[in-house]
Swiss-Prot record:
Chain intervals for the UniProt region annotation (Disordered): 200-244, 482-525
Protein name per UniProt: Probable E3 ubiquitin ligase complex SCF subunit scon-2
Lineage summary: Eukaryota, Fungi, Dikarya, Ascomycota, Pezizomycotina
Family of this protein: Belongs to the WD repeat MET30/SCONB/SCON-2 family.
Induction: Expressed only under low-sulfur conditions and expression is under the control of the cys-3 transcriptional activator.
Residue ranges occupied by any F-box domain in the UniProt entry: 124-170
PROSITE patterns xrefs: FBOX, WD_REPEATS_1, WD_REPEATS_2, WD_REPEATS_REGION
Record-linked CDD domains: F-box_SpPof1-like (cd22147), WD40 (cd00200)
Effect of residue 167 to G: Leads to constitutive sulfur system repression
Signal peptide boundaries: none
This protein's GO CC annotations: nuclear SCF ubiquitin ligase complex; nucleus
Amino acid sequence: MSSVLMSKTVTPFLREHIPSIYAPIGKPGNQETARAENPNSKYCYRHHPDSKCRRAADKAKMVMIQSELDKLTSADQQAVTHVWSLFSAAPARHRDLMLQGILSQLCFPQLSFVSREVNEALKIDFISALPVELAQKVLCYLDTVSLTKAAQVSQRWRTLADSDAVWVRMCEQHVNRKCTKCGWGLPLLERKKLRNYTRQRQLAKGGPQGRVTELADSHDSQDRSVNQHGKRPAAEAEEEDPIKKRQCMAAAEASKAVTQPKTRSWKAVYRDRWQVSYNWKNSRYKLSVLKGHENGVTCLQLDDNILATGSYDTTIKIWNIETEECIRTLVGHTAGIRALQFDDSKLISGSLDHTIKVWNWHTGECLSTFAAHTDSVISVHFDGHLLASGSSDKTVKIFDFNSKETYCLKGHSDWVNSTHVDIKSRTVFSASDDTTIKLWDLDTRQVIRTYEGHVGHVQQVLILPPEYEPDEEVLNGASQDNQDAMSVSSGGSGSPSMSHAQIERAGSPGSHSSSHNLLPSSLPSGDEDVRHLYGSAFVADESRPLPPRYFMTGGLDSTMRLWDSATGRCLRTLFGHLEGVWSLAGDTIRVISGANDGMVKTWEPRSGKCDATYTGHCGPVTCVGLSDSLMASGSEDGTIRLHSFKPCRQ
């Protein structure tokens, strides 16, 4: 192309369009008119100088292009450069026209080359380009593996992927619950750390006599020498020596600096819990065997760093889990210990000597003894100011520590092996050798419902947390089975509906429930329907909390059963143990069971799947305990096996 021809064709084109490219300010007048007359007077979103999608030129590619261009003759270099200049200066409509013409002339190898180049050019960093709030919203949909990979892309991605706004959502979805999407559930550790901190503060304050009278929330209590405003009385402050006063202030500041909790990111919170959950899922644990009892271990309770065990040797031992040492032995019963429970200040035990004792487990002192039963005490459970005990005399005794009242609940025809008080709803669950479980109303002292289904002695009743919800397929399957049963019993009418009067009778005190006489699961959808199922006492007082909805039981028929306390339905039966189930423990994430076959099993409570089986005991496993990162089991072989799922660094 001659210079004359070039000046006649290329120069006018560039003269017309280049100013709008390098000075895209827009023409005066109406904005829409200016945009229509000057379509390239505004930057596109990709080439706008402020756009985060705009990438710097690829240095390697530019060097390669320059190298290839240098290989051409001067005329060819000028021609190629003019093509680039024309395309660069062309408006959007002209560019589209140029590209269509060029693409229509390309052969397949050239089309493949264009496809590869376009594929790379279309990739933009949309996370960095989006506003922070939208980018975090997008990242909230990723799982943990994808999030950790996203944090490795760039510093910008790492800042967004590690932000608290993303990981707090992840914690809400997994901590203290089972995620319905991925199946992972993470333990709630902070509550236990708070208790440990409270206990350490109590130990540092003074002797054990003062600790007995403190409540579980004693970390909120104030020093007696400090008034409501956090100040000492003026007279007392004036009497203090100035030097001593400065020393006290310095010590207080140092103590405050040490004890003040550090702020942690939500990602770190999630990581700590994920490590514990990973160890549970893969059965990675540290095993400790505690020996000290001279006979079989019958009961235990695990709480943070303290383990309490009872035995047929008539003693109760208090263990320090970290040091694996017995720090105290409680002696006073004259026969084997069958049940115990403790909190921060007291321990209550039930024995074969027909008595219940209240201990100060910090000192080993027996504070009081109750001789309310006429036979062996098999179970004890307290909640607040109420204590329930079950005995081989076939009765349940209720002790009210506030009113000093004691009364008896009669209805079982055999030993009462397990009791559980729910102080909010003022109800008690009891399990018996007569193969039934009963729900009692403490206001009327009558049976609300009797649950039938086990064919062997029922040894344990485990109340599931309020957050627990069974799988929908469990509810749907149970509902379908129940509807079929009702259709048959109604002469094939096919109508599963029940009248209001039937609901009243089904929820009345003393009613029986079994797998063949159940209420449809579609009924208790609202609070009013559920209240009718628990009887007239709950209907009359709408402010009264309802009893726990779901619970599990273990029996000597080698099965565990999941129950709906409102309908009386057995929702699921868990099989796996070869011999009778003696003990259960659980939380929102897992349930563990100990049986006469010497095995401990962990279960997923929603699906009913057995996650793992632990062996090692040389006798029946009579008791189990569970915390977020620990599992304890006691056996008639006289040992306690402690499984710690804490990360090694802890």
